[in-house]
């Protein structure tokens, strides 16, 4: 909007005093769509909320394991082709206190889990442990080259923790997203810094870009084709 100038006003001074981009109000009425990220797995969720949220605000949102803590990544202004949840509430001090207590418990649980894997000589690797905010259970994410019979392990862990134990196998790309790291380009891995969701990558993408297919150069830290091959799709 062009500011109105008084007859005796200096045009340069008047324009300089008018901000080009006026500050946006912190609170708006209506319902807005936000992109959220789960802290333990870096998975992305989409949820609606009735008020404006700052980036990095912690909220409570429904997940596969019940209500849990997620961080606001930003507001979404275009439609998304995925399931959309509803934010339960902005995380309270009590929610954040419980979340921090759970994170301390997770570190100890991971050590016990790794010790039990070694005891039972199972070919699997512990990636992370998670205590949901409002659920009486503990979830272990692991990777393995093949299917693992861990029934005895689950019984042992259940007796140790005195609660419901759930083991969930994840693939190599999901593992890389959780663990993170720096790739050969010197930047953080795309799967945990650029993409909100893991996109499929195929050999066809390499051929379409007229790139030489050298396995050592085209493979990422996860052992699969690099996510950056999808940038020009």
From Swiss-Prot:
This is Protein tpl. Supposed to have signal peptidase II-like activity. The gene is tpl. Residues 85-170 form the PSP1 C-terminal domain. Pfam families: PSP1 (PF04468). GO terms for cellular component: cytoplasm. InterPro entries: PSP1-like (IPR047767), PSP1_C (IPR007557).
């Amino acid at each position: 909007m062009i500011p109105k100038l008084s007859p005796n006003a200096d045009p340069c001074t008047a324009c300089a005093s008018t901000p080009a981009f006026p500050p946006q109000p912190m609170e708006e009425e209506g319902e807005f769509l936000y992109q959220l990220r789960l802290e333990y797995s870096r998975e992305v969720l989409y949820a609606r909320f009735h008020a404006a949220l700052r980036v990095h605000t912690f909220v409570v949102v429904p997940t596969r394991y019940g209500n849990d803590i997620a961080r606001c990544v930003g507001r979404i202004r275009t439609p998304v082709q995925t399931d959309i949840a509803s934010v339960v509430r902005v995380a309270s001090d009590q929610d954040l206190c419980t979340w921090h207590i759970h994170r301390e418990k997770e570190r100890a649980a991971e050590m016990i889990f790794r010790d039990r894997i070694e005891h039972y000589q199972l070919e699997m690797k512990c990636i992370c442990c998670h205590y949901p905010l409002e659920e009486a259970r503990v979830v272990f994410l692991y990777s393995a080259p093949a299917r693992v019979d861990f029934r005895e392990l689950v019984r042992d862990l259940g007796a140790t923790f005195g609660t419901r134990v759930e083991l969930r196998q994840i693939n190599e790309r999901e593992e890389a997203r959780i663990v993170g790291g720096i790739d050969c380009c010197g930047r953080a891995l795309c799967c945990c810094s650029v993409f909100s969701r893991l996109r499929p990558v195929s050999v066809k993408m390499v051929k379409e870009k007229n790139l030489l297919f050298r396995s050592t150069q085209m493979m990422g830290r996860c052992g699969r084709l690099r996510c950056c091959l999808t940038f020009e799709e």
